[in-house]
Curated annotation (Swiss-Prot):
HAMAP family recorded: Ribosomal_uL11
Organism in which the protein naturally occurs: Malacoplasma penetrans (strain HF-2)
Keywords: Methylation, Ribonucleoprotein, Ribosomal protein, RNA-binding, rRNA-binding
Description of post-translational modifications: One or more lysine residues are methylated.
Record-given protein name: Large ribosomal subunit protein uL11
GO cellular component: cytosolic large ribosomal subunit
Phylogenetic classification of the source organism: Bacteria, Bacillati, Mycoplasmatota, Mycoplasmoidales, Mycoplasmoidaceae
Name of the gene this protein is made from: rplK
Annotated GO biological process: translation
Signal sequence range: none
PANTHER family: 60S RIBOSOMAL PROTEIN L12, LARGE RIBOSOMAL SUBUNIT PROTEIN UL11M
NCBIfam families for this protein: L11_bact
Subunit structure: Part of the ribosomal stalk of the 50S ribosomal subunit. Interacts with L10 and the large rRNA to form the base of the stalk. L10 forms an elongated spine to which L12 dimers bind in a sequential fashion forming a multimeric L10(L12)X complex.
Function: Forms part of the ribosomal stalk which helps the ribosome interact with GTP-bound translation factors.
GO molecular function terms listed in the Swiss-Prot or TrEMBL record: large ribosomal subunit rRNA binding; structural constituent of ribosome
Coiled coil: none
Length: 155
């Protein structure tokens, strides 16, 4: 999408920003994109009011006439894992420290949420991606080994 969009001469900028759902405000992060910030924040907050307080990635396409389009992505895996594990930060040393454990069901729920934003074909593949992120944060997922591949071999 991004490469095709730059062929359109009306586009001035494509930016990826992380905003708080339902709480976006005009500011320097949006000013540099060159869009009508008031209109953008109104539309963004309306579309993300059900995700109030969550970090929401958003891809904004700005046009020469100050108009814009935007695409809302799903919340980052790290945020979803912290929420599921009920923690504020991950482990300082994830190789030796485990800060929380979550159930396979919670991890699968996160994988289903992220399935639309990945290039994976099935939930199990996304579950392994989620498990890898969890491992880096010091979060253990019951019954999931992030280093076992489909063929059963360990990395």
């Amino acid at each position: 999408m991004l490469l095709v969009a730059f062929k359109d001469p009306r586009i001035t900028r494509i930016a990826k920003v992380n905003l708080i759902g339902g709480q976006a405000k005009p500011g320097p992060q949006l000013a540099s994109i060159g869009i009508n910030m008031g209109e953008f924040t109104k539309q963004f907050n309306d579309q993300t009011k059900d995700k109030n307080g969550e970090v929401i990635p958003c891809i904004i396409t700005a046009f020469k006439d100050k108009s814009f389009t935007f695409e809302i992505k799903t919340t980052p895996v790290t945020m979803l894992l912290k929420k599921a594990a009920n923690i504020k930060v991950g482990a300082k040393n994830s190789k030796t420290e485990t800060v929380a454990t979550i159930s396979r069901e919670k991890a699968l729920e996160i994988a289903k949420t992220k399935l639309v934003d990945t290039n994976a074909n099935d939930e199990e593949a996304v579950l392994r991606m989620v498990a890898g992120s969890a491992k880096q944060m010091g979060i253990k997922i019951e019954g999931v080994d992030p280093v076992v591949h489909k063929d059963g071999k360990k990395k």
